[in-house]
Structures are given as structure tokens and as C-alpha cells.
């Protein structure tokens, strides 16, 4: 995937990404509150296909369905120097590509165009020419991401009713299923 990059720092927790007040809102309104505590107005600027780049321990904190809100905003992928393991798994479950790239915050600036290939582990800053390769994710994770997340994958494999497959890709399902949102 290729997109415009937004760079954030280290130790961004889920409370800052999805504040308690947002949990009372519907998905579209809650998504507009992502990062408002650390970068007010960001959701007015982010565009479908953009990529969030962050530092170490991205997504620490409680298990909030932030990945669903990134999906609602149209964020194409998350790339971090290191993910909190629970947050990483929630992103995969929501079908949001997440790639670990050590040193990525030094390789990109806001507005750079980045290309990230989960299948090969290759990444490239199309603006500056920097690039590299990281270990490829396991096939199971790549399959879950390709299927749009864990629930749609289960529906497509017959473990859930097939007619739910498209519905289960919805950000509203992920947020409502967590106890937040509508």
C-alpha cells in the first residue's frame, strides 16, 4: 500500500486515541475524536488511504477498538517501531494492516509518501528514497488481513453465517461489540 504518512511519537495509548467521551458517540462521530488530545484537528486533515506511522509501544493501555475507528477514517495502515501486542492483535482482527518497522519515525516526516508491502516486508519512503526490509508477518495474519479481519474470515470459512461477512467488516460492529459506540 502507498499513501501519505502522518508521524506520531512513542507510547501513544488507546485512551488518547479513543477518549472516554467518544465511547458515547456513534462510530462516525467517535472517529472524529481520534488523536484530538495529541493532535487536535488531525481527523479533519487525514484522508482515505493515508498511513499512520508511530514510534515505540504504539497502542498501549486498555483494549479499546481504535482500529475500527482508523478503518472508519479510511486509514490504510498502521506502521510503528513497536506495537503493544494487544493493540496489534486488535488491528489485525479489525482487518487493519499493521507493520513493525524499527526506526520508521526517523525515516519519515509528515506528508511524505510511503510504500509498505506486508507480503514482502519491504518499505520505502517515496519522498526521500529511504527504505528497507523487515520480517514478513505469518501467513495466518496475512490471511486474516486479506479477508478484512477475523470475523469476516470466520464467516467466509463457514464458522459464522455467510450473510454476515460484509456486515462484520463494518467499523460499527467492532465498536458496538466492544461495549462502546452506538
Curated annotation (Swiss-Prot):
Entry superkingdom: Bacteria
A GO biological process held by the record: L-leucine biosynthetic process
Keyword Hydrolase appears in the UniProt entry: no
One MF annotation (Gene Ontology) recorded for this entry: 3-isopropylmalate dehydratase activity
Top-level enzyme category: lyase
The reaction(s) this protein catalyses: (2R,3S)-3-isopropylmalate = (2S)-2-isopropylmalate
EC number: 4.2.1.33
Pfam families cross-referenced by the UniProt entry: Aconitase_C (PF00694)
Pathway annotation from the record: Amino-acid biosynthesis; L-leucine biosynthesis; L-leucine from 3-methyl-2-oxobutanoate: step 2/4
Keyword Amino-acid biosynthesis assigned: yes
InterPro entries, sorted: Aconitase/3IPM_dehydase_swvl, AconitaseA/IPMdHydase_ssu_swvl, LeuD, LeuD_type2/HacB/DmdB
Keywords associated with the record: Amino-acid biosynthesis, Branched-chain amino acid biosynthesis, Leucine biosynthesis, Lyase
Role: Catalyzes the isomerization between 2-isopropylmalate and 3-isopropylmalate, via the formation of 2-isopropylmaleate.
PANTHER family documented for this protein: 3-ISOPROPYLMALATE DEHYDRATASE SMALL SUBUNIT (PTHR43345:SF9), 3-ISOPROPYLMALATE DEHYDRATASE SMALL SUBUNIT 2-RELATED-RELATED (PTHR43345)
Subunit composition and interactions: Heterodimer of LeuC and LeuD.
Similarity annotation: Belongs to the LeuD family. LeuD type 2 subfamily.
Protein name in UniProt: 3-isopropylmalate dehydratase small subunit
Originating organism: Mycolicibacterium smegmatis (strain ATCC 700084 / mc(2)155)
Gene encoding the protein: leuD
Amino acid at each position: 500500500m502507498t499513501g501519505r504518512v502522518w508521524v506520531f511519537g512513542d507510547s501513544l495509548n488507546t485512551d488518547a486515541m479513543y477518549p472516554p467521551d467518544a465511547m458515547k458517540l456513534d462510530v462516525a462521530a467517535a472517529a472524529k475524536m481520534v488523536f484530538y488530545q495529541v493532535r487536535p484537528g488531525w481527523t479533519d486533515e487525514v484522508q482515505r488511504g493515508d498511513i499512520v506511522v508511530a514510534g515505540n509501544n504504539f497502542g498501549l493501555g486498555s483494549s479499546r477498538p481504535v482500529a475500527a475507528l482508523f478503518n472508519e477514517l479510511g486509514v490504510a495502515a498502521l506502521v510503528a517501531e513497536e506495537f503493544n501486542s494487544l493493540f496489534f492483535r486488535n488491528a489485525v482482527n479489525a482487518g487493519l494492516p499493521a507493520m513493525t518497522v524499527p526506526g520508521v519515525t526517523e525515516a519519515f516526516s509528515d506528508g511524505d509518501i510511503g510504500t509498505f508491502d506486508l507480503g514482502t516486508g519491504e518499505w520505502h519512503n517515496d519522498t526521500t528514497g529511504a527504505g528497507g526490509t523487515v520480517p514478513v508477518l505469518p501467513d495466518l495474519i496475512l490471511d486474516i488481513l486479506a479477508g478484512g479481519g477475523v470475523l469476516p474470515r470466520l464467516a467466509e470459512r463457514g464458522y459464522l453465517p455467510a450473510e454476515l461477512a460484509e456486515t462484520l467488516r463494518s467499523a460499527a460492529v467492532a465498536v458496538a461489540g466492544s461495549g462502546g459506540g452506538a
